[in-house]
Amino acid sequence: MRDGYAPTLAPVAYTRREGGLPRRTPVKSADDPQRCRLPFTAVDNPQALAEEARARAVAAGLRGTVRVAGEGINLVLAGAGEAVRTWVDWLRAEPRFAGLVVKESYSRAQPFQRLKVKVKPELISFRRADASPLQGRAPTVAPADLARWIGQGCDDKGRRLVLLDTRNREEVGHGSFVGALTLPIDNFTELPAALVPHRDELADATVVSFCTGGIRCEKAALHLQADGMDNLLQLDGGILGYFEQVGGFGYDGRCFVFDGRVALDPALEPLVDGDEAMATG
């Protein structure tokens, strides 16, 4: 499996040669990436889950970020491959997380400087009651189908296609789908207001929202559906899922990621790798 994030868990395994010289080591996954699920599931006691997650990650020597909320868990962890897998096996042993699909990727060096485990009101702050992922998913479009639509310039019903980037301007600066509607936002909470001037131009189109791995576009799609937009889909698996399954067709640039690799190209190769990755985490 190449570098990349899943919309659920995204452990990154790394190894080194004897003598400390780094090497790239691909780590295979037994999971079918087409069965990815978002990490949304009800968590009754987020604090207790976070505390155990932290203790087990510390004991295993893992670094990265774990976010726990009443709506689920999301994380990216890096460490020795077996240590990452053991941690994931612990989480999956709990029935509510048993179906989570994990993608493994690799790095020449540890891309995180420390371990951060946080309890949050939401996995990603949006502050919209009508965007609760526990109430159901918004409709999705598979990467291969979106690539076909991009190629033909419309969806399968001949309807005009608009790609809606739900990420912030820093992320967009690294790349986006060609011709996508991008918004001048710095925080995800600004998205609803930033979309208001564009609502008329979206009315007669099939709108596909997208983000890095699927969490933000899920919430954005749910909110816009509740706000009366019934022509909206979300890209299943986000940009990185698209890269993995399709490549870079219709995409210009890289996809920003929230670790020391900075951004990934459509071949899922990092902008920054090796020892530099440790310095920029």
Walk through the language-model features, giving the residues of each.
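Rhodanese-like catalytic fold shared by cysteine-dependent sulfurtransferases
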Residues: 2-139, 158-161, 167-207, 212-281
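A short acidic-Thr-Gly-centered motif at the start of a beta-strand
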Residues: 147-158
